[in-house]
């Protein structure tokens, strides 16, 4: 019927070269741009090319874009320039004044959409051509109003689309919100309407401006927005806005914002939001796939139109001729295909002379043309080669008219609506590389490696936006190949493999997935997969990916779903409007009420059935619970009977809390003593370390006389201070000066550098030992702490917590339980008490018989309160003897005391009482135990004291005095009773308890086993305590041994100090002699220089030379005083020593006369004794008292008695020389004795010796000083004796001599160190005795030098330890 004719005027013909434009204008010779033909009633407007378009379709046809005809140099728009409207209502067509009416109102067949890249080509081509502007085409008055409207330009404003079109302001339903008041809701409505204007929602910006006025912080406002925006649309409906204002009010009044909205508020807001959304009408037209130039956001640029190759000759081409105008078809030789456009019986349009209906009008090219056009549908049509126009819309020919004289409407061909998804034909140029792309996308081996590139599948072909049918077929086959299980979709992991085979970049594939996966489902169905593949194909051919999916690529499933939602909303809205306007909502609906009644009846029946089933189940559960409860009651009764029958049942009511608290207090008391003991041990360790260091210094000084260790440190901890170093340097300088005078070289020992090293090594050793002991103490302390913590934890673990106490009160007293359970508990208690009474009655006979046999009748006549004390320890039948509550309480208390005693005994503490005996027996036993312990303690103390005295005697080498020891022993109080007795008592009690338990029933066997376990634990604890006590005793023994060693070291130290003092005295004497010699040499020099002034010089030099007398012999004088204080025989020796004073004064020459010595000596010692408090006592007591005092001292008694013998030996050699220093020595002695009152015996001489050495050093450096320049110590007392001395001695030089002699006499050591007193004095005496023989051998200087040389032998026995005084003082402290 419609055999293969083209449906569109011009089809998809290509452009002709622009060079043909002048010829075409000549062919249309009378047509100017502003003229044209008159509008005819055919609905066609004059075309720019001179042809008038013909209606080739039906109404409701989508807009056809202008197609290009095959005329060279001129684009021939043969389609509609604007979308035609449906039908030809009332339209008339006039062809050469032959009006024909066509009125066909039929549905138009679907027509394919022209691709978007070709929709703007006519305008672009026409703009590029230099042709004059085309006249404005006016619509013809044919009555087609809809068609005229469709030809409006796209720039006209279009109505807003979507369901939220403004309809004169916000519509707020009259629904009351429960979370705000009516006044607040009215205010919020007013505010919302004023802010939102004509819309329905409040935008985010306006919402922010309103909410910021609340002056809340950003975090609160952010939380309020999150809670209020329930739809998550970024906009607020009125209920959401009211909710936001409500939350702001909550925050302003100080309340906290909820983290999640309450369900009631959330439901109200959501319901009101849904009502508002449904109330908005859907006014927008239905979606269409027609391309919109205004809304097009694709950045794709249409491909440039390539100019075709020029034709070889224009003669083969037919010139274009306007259709529908008479007189223009003469130039055509039948080259157009006839196209029926009306009734065949009508006149031919465009061909004069023809009558009778509309004749087919040629609208295309002749069949002999080489470039026919394709016009859309690929149905049955004659094969035609493609035109060289590079446009491949491939529109198929469609039947557009009627044939014959049929009056029926024209039938439409299936050409499709432009833009319809999946029904677009492939372009004329085909789809290049589509086969390669399909094969590449198919599942294949080796795809796991992912080495895919775009090589071989890229190109620059023209691809339409819509998916063509060929593409859809291929993409569906690829989809089915990958969807092996037939799920209808592929997941993301499969899509990664499929799309990755295309070789595109990852960002492009991600964008393609985002565009294809509508709704972000994470999977693609068949249509979405085709969209993704189409986008990949376009990307491979050089097209960029769009920002959003164009309408042509929206899958039908998605579009239909959205349309369905819109349709449902429209229906709901229409129904609600109808019911609201008609008032149907207010009228009751009978059918609805009946339906509800039936539904409720069904629900009630179901509830009744459910309740019956639940009741049956509850009954079954109740019966089961009752059986289980009864079974549990029976088991509890059996267990209670077993508990009552147990022999230790009477002990379960004992209050263990009091016992536990008492043990805690005792443990705390013992723990508190630990720090004090540890601190005492540490102090003892420090004192021992200091003593060891001092002892090493003394031994080192004795072993190395010339070593640097002779420097005694007087600083803290025995550190050597700067003053100590000055003293040592002064002493060394004195030695060097004396060596210079004698002419002998002093050998400096090499030990000076080794002394600090030895001291440091010893100090390190002592410190290491001290640290080891400290670690031991810390270990002991830590172990004791751990032990105490363990005991405390064990006591705590056994204690009752609040929860256990609550449970006890609940299940024993029946508090907080049901009545049935409470009755059961009381029943158990009653049965338990009755069982106890029965067992006590049965077991009373045996204990009563044993008690009658063992105890006296007086014990049986005791009151019930005293009976519990006589009853044996835990037994099953003893509790039944006591009927009253007082007796039972006393019995329980007695049992608790026994257990406490056992625990205390295990801890080593004496138990208060012993079980199984009366009070009188207990008192007698305790008395005997105390007596035995006291006797044992005394014996042990005596033994220890004897051992200590024996050790002391062995270390001292002297047997201890027997009369003194017993006194000390008896004076000492007896030590506390040892813990061994307590432990023995505990073991005895345990043994007796075991014996008593064996005599009772066989049921006690289990109790014995438990007690044995407890006993083993207690024994282990006792062993641990014994070990701890042994360690403590060992530490005590070490402390005692350390004390003994310290005492011995003190004694040795004192002896060494005495020796060093003697040696210092000898050294002082030698120094005095040296100074005297120097003074005499200076005096002789002065006498030689000034012979005339000899008398005056003698008077002046006298007192100057007295200064060395007072300054130098201090050590000797002090030692001499101490010597006098200790032994009785010193008086005869003292006069001999002092007598040389006048002799030396009278004789300036070398030999001092001895007879003059005796006269002045006696008086000064008396003054010295009266001024010294110690010497006063000695003088008052006399010789006998002195002897008795010496005998009372156990340490100095023997040496003091032996002193008289060596005294005369010392006096004889020294008596010749030193006599003049006597008064000065007395003065210094008094000062020294005053000092000794404040300081210890050891500190005095040490400090004095240092000062004397300094004074000697500085005295020898400068000229002699007068008496007025002396220290304060020698000013008061020495003046009187000094005055007496000058008249006796005429020359001043002799005073230094007596100083040399004076120290020679006092070498005997002071009383404190007796052991070394006798031995040291003799060695210095021989050189002193030999001294007088030397002077007469030569002249005066030679005599003095000879005496000094004779004293040189003293250096061999001299110890250069200067630390004696300071060290002794520190030890005494």
Curated annotation (Swiss-Prot):
It comes from the Eukaryota. Pfam families: DUF1720, EH. GO terms for cellular component: actin cortical patch; cytoplasm; endosome membrane; plasma membrane. CDD domains: EH. Residues 184-272, 471-560 form the EH domain. The keyword Cell membrane applies. Residues 1-170, 283-309, 339-359, 764-812, 828-882, 903-1373 are annotated as: Disordered. One of its GO terms (molecular function) is actin binding. Residues 1090-1103, 1224-1244 have a biased composition (Acidic residues). Its main location: membrane. InterPro entries: DUF1720, EF-hand-dom_pair, EF_hand_dom, EH_dom. Residues 289-298, 1106-1118, 1182-1194 have a biased composition (Polar residues). Residues 216-251, 504-539 form the EF-hand domain. Residues 837-847, 922-954, 982-1001, 1013-1050, 1072-1086 have a biased composition (Basic and acidic residues). SMART domains: EH (SM00027). Residues 1-59, 81-105, 114-141, 299-308, 348-359, 861-880, 1135-1149, 1156-1166, 1277-1287 have a biased composition (Low complexity). Residues 1340-1357 form the WH2 domain. One of its GO terms (biological process) is endocytosis. Residues 1288-1335 have a biased composition (Pro residues). The keyword Cytoplasm applies. Belongs to the PAN1 family. Component of the PAN1 actin cytoskeleton-regulatory complex required for the internalization of endosomes during actin-coupled endocytosis. The complex links the site of endocytosis to the cell membrane-associated actin cytoskeleton. Mediates uptake of external molecules and vacuolar degradation of plasma membrane proteins. Plays a role in the proper organization of the cell membrane-associated actin cytoskeleton and promotes its destabilization. Component of the PAN1 actin cytoskeleton-regulatory complex. This is Actin cytoskeleton-regulatory complex protein pan1. The gene is pan1.
